[in-house]
């Protein structure tokens, strides 16, 4: 035993020494903001064209892989995920059903690398393979395309197929004739329908609307600027798109360069199009135009709703507009107003607010309006509004999340998918005649005996200011509150996004290996509505990471765990949450994982996807202070003992520029007074986590999984005695 301990100590010592000898060069830049001097020690790492920068990133990634290779069960997660996929047999995703009952979907068999596009004429029709992305550009080397979005025409005669690779959001869109499988020679290349507003077909199926980017250089600062909604007619030159909703086409609408003009979903029978100017505000400005006018080339968009109306999820229903209203409401109301004489502040209230339940989403059918509510973002319910009455619909089992699906306002067809932290998503069709939900799964229901002993406990803990923070606890029924449990705390807290329950196999595998998972629903998210979002927004952003700190202290106090058994995990904007929790309370956590994280928000405005409306702008003195306060990079201090940290990024990340995690890692390595590892791993074949083959995603997650178990002391993840140094 003494020999084993000695070898592990030697391993850590050599590890620490090796990393300290490969620090990044520092070329500081000093700037002054409203009288405050800010020193950016690693501004040089923002130059991704510099070979020295790329070589240092590659050397650190190689070093990280060397360290991870010492962990005996590094590959456990990816191997187990592939085993679970094999057990399931196949998976179905991105299902689209046309009004004439044609089914289009992506299907991946367990032995395949990526999903293919399939078609059926009706639920019980014969399955037909339409397209395999492996065949796209297969005459060229080093391509790895995945289908990330599909959109059939109204009659199902044609389908648009969006494909991307290596984490890029920009896609190639091709159009196929479903009957003949003929693919049009024209390819759209400056759009990203999986991320930006999808594809919306013309009534006559001769073309579609989509969002077009002004440049295909995703690293350009102007990449997300001056986007426009365009009309593409099949068979025409993709370079000659027809602008129908944009700053240039509609200057009178005063659309700014950093806003995204998009079309809302519509039905064939609708007489109008609704356009929305999308930014990162909770409520947005909308406009309306008749279909006839727009297709005749007219530009007479009329103002519809204003952000002050607090109207969301607008949908045309005959001569009315149905919407979710937050006006004078903390929990939302379901309302409608006349399309010819609209009044969003004084509408007809169909469903008044339900105390404690937030109205989230709805679908309109010819039989009524189905809608969902959530409590604390984790307890979902389903209702139907019909003939002026509001009635609950019994769910097959308690669910944390419900997704709604319908054919349109003139059809009865309505489906839901229920899921939870420990329940795999199942699909049900509502039978109007008997008022009941019947199973209609397209993916096999699989048995997971290794997850049968897992339970979920939804609790609230009191933050330092008295606010009640929802926390989802997921653990084995055999858990003991002895302070020894290895806890993984996941957290986000931005953009008003709710961390809704889903069947997270990563969580369940963590638990099956002896750990416990906590999801902290911190302020800045949408679990408790707009107020919750504004509680972790710009100047109030410190609540976001302090809620995480308070949740961690609660779990320690209640003997679920202890400081040396806690790992925190945050992805994307969740990087702010875990980064600032770590820099404010470095003593509280054993390990920190920042996955493609926002680590240097003070510099966000210089990137293609800067978010001044969510986090703040350096042009405003108050917001500058807020940005500096939430900046984890600028809160790293010399001589502080920081926890073990795993920092990941994607070289093709269009959401969070890769130099944010890179700079954070470089500064942490240079200033950390502890011998805890700081690992940087950049995926040179990926981006923000999506648009890559599943096995690649599993491998990336598996490395973070193994790192956390290693640091929390799991015996199966400790370096072996015969490890090569």
Residue positions per predicted region:
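Positively charged n-region of N-terminal signal peptides that target proteins for export
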Residues: 1-5
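Beta-propeller folds
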Residues: 7-11, 16-403, 407-413, 419-425, ...
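Glycine-rich His-Gly loop
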Residues: 108, 326, 419, 490-494, ...
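Cap/lid segment of the alpha/beta-hydrolase catalytic domain
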Residues: 135-150, 163-167, 182-189, 430-436, ...
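Surface-exposed acidic, glycine/proline-enriched linker/cap segments
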Residues: 139-142, 246, 253-256, 452-453, ...
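Active-site lining segments that contact anionic ligands and/or coordinate catalytic metals
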Residues: 270-271, 283-286, 311, 318-319, ...
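Extracellular/periplasmic ectodomains of large secreted or surface enzymes and adhesion receptors
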Residues: 366, 386-387, 391-393, 409-415, ...
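Active-site-proximal cap/loop segments of hydrolase catalytic domains
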Residues: 519-725
